């Protein structure tokens, strides 16, 4: 999955998001899912990766774990740049397959990043989550690549340090109240909601105004 951080916060989606087939009216991050992960299935010639995946069964079905299914994880282990499972299990992988799959992984990532960027300029890319292990070389769409400590468990860390926030919306008539005054009032309402939810008053700041 690929997202964009703006001022330290995920960029919000401007389209309706469906969760389990249900249309929602929530603020949701703008995320592009490209169907590429450690368990993604790789074709015999290496030219097609995903979107099918062995998912959590990677540790039993992937070649490096003693299974019989060629996955993206097997490809990066075969390059010799990543140590996961038993590399001897992919020693017989054809070089053409490994090279084709490595190129396809890079192509998918670069295409996804280009689609999400607000401009054509390269941006820093932060690699987190289990799928980050698939990125073993520089990406053309990235100005730099950052791999934080404990990046593999970023989801758990994010859940543990999630920030408390408040949100307020109101329809106003600028004939009755100036815009700036209306914004200030709604901002105060949002801050009050954040404080009521347990936010620290010393660290409150406005994340976004529409």
Q: Across the structure, where does each feature detected by a protein language model lie?
A:
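Helical "lid/coupling" subdomains associated with nucleotide-phosphate turnover
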Residues: 3-210
